[in-house]
């Protein structure tokens, strides 16, 4: 729906991945141009988080997010590390897991090209 074609290997990766996974696919579409990467690529995060999955299911739309820091600023590893100025600049913060101190696992990022090329961008 948000890319012209999903390579068959993407489904295998989604099923077999044991950690968060982001797939960078060709020909992103039906999203704001600011969401697209170079050459109109689209990065789709496959999440197992039950809250995110339920939000997407109920909204019937993808969620768009960014890092919890300003460009060039330090990357927070837990909610307490997010600056107050950033928190006050958003519309809503889910009242969940704010006391957690364990850093989340970064996603594996894999570039899947329509011609079959596969490139691991981040393990």
Predicted regions and their residues:
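Active-site-adjacent structural elements in enzyme catalytic cores
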Residues: 1-123
């Amino acid at each position: 729906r948000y890319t012209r074609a999903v390579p068959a290997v993407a489904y295998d990766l989604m099923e077999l991945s044991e950690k968060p996974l982001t797939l960078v696919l060709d020909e992103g579409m039906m999203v704001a141009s600011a969401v697209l990467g170079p050459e109109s690529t689209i990065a789709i995060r496959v999440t197992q988080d039950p809250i995110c999955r339920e939000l997407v299911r109920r909204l019937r739309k993808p969620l768009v997010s960014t890092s919890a820091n300003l460009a060039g600023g330090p990357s927070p590893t837990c909610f307490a590390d997010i600056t107050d100025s950033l928190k006050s600049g958003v519309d809503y913060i889910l009242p969940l897991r704010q006391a957690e101190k364990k850093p989340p696992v970064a996603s594996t990022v894999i570039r899947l090209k329509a011609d079959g090329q596969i490139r691991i961008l981040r393990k």
